[in-house]
């Protein structure tokens, strides 16, 4: 598994000041994707336990509200085990900080029954669709994408949108 970059202080991908990791590899190839350099599964840098340690360390400051996971596609079958490992470790160390994740997969069709969902607080799901692009939307690029409260969705066994 590989990653493209880590942003130490990110204010555009989730609420508050966050640490963001952009995983490498995506098979969706959305038209006009903002992050095409993350498509190649062989690009970027190796994702190791040391990288997880670095992310955990970067999140230690009180002003960091959580971790954001983007891509590429962190939930792709080639990446999901590493994503799960990162999420588990993050929540062990920071149970009161949030994990936000972006995926082209639909939560109710692919992720609802995956173990990684137990650790994610907010998920933006759905592929970016150029024809539905709306720059006024918060945390997403196109109107088909949903901002989901994952824990409430799991509890209710149906998609519950995140309202803030």
Pin down the residues of each PLM region.
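Conserved, mostly hydrophobic/aromatic
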Residues: 21, 30, 123
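Conserved Radical SAM active-site core
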Residues: 1-3, 17, 35-101, 107-113
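Conserved C-terminal portion of the radical SAM core fold
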Residues: 60-69, 93-94, 98, 124-130, ...
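Structural recognition of alpha->loop->beta junctions
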Residues: 53-56, 60, 112-132
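P-loop/Walker A phosphate-binding loop and immediately adjacent motor/lid segment at beta-alpha junctions
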Residues: 78-83, 88-91, 133-164
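A generic structural signal for alpha->beta connector loops
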Residues: 96, 119-120, 144
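N-terminal [4Fe-4S]-dependent radical SAM core
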Residues: 1-22, 27, 35-41, 160, ...
């Amino acid at each position: 598994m590989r990653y493209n970059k880590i942003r130490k202080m990110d204010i555009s991908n989730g609420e508050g000041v966050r640490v963001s990791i952009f995983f490498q590899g995506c098979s969706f190839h959305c038209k006009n994707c903002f992050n095409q350099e993350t498509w190649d599964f062989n690009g970027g840098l190796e994702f190791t336990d040391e990288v997880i340690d670095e992310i955990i360390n970067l999140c230690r400051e009180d002003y960091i509200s959580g971790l954001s996971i983007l891509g590429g596609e962190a939930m792709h079958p080639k990446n999901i085990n590493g994503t799960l490992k990162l999420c588990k470790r993050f929540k062990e160390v920071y149970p009161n900080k949030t994990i936000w994740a972006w995926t082209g997969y639909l939560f109710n069709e692919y992720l609802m029954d995956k173990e990684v969902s137990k650790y994610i607080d907010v998920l933006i799901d759905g592929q970016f669709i150029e024809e539905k692009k709306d720059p006024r939307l918060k945390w997403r690029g196109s109107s088909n994408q949903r901002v989901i409260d994952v824990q409430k969705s799991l509890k209710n066994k149906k998609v519950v949108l995140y309202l803030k």
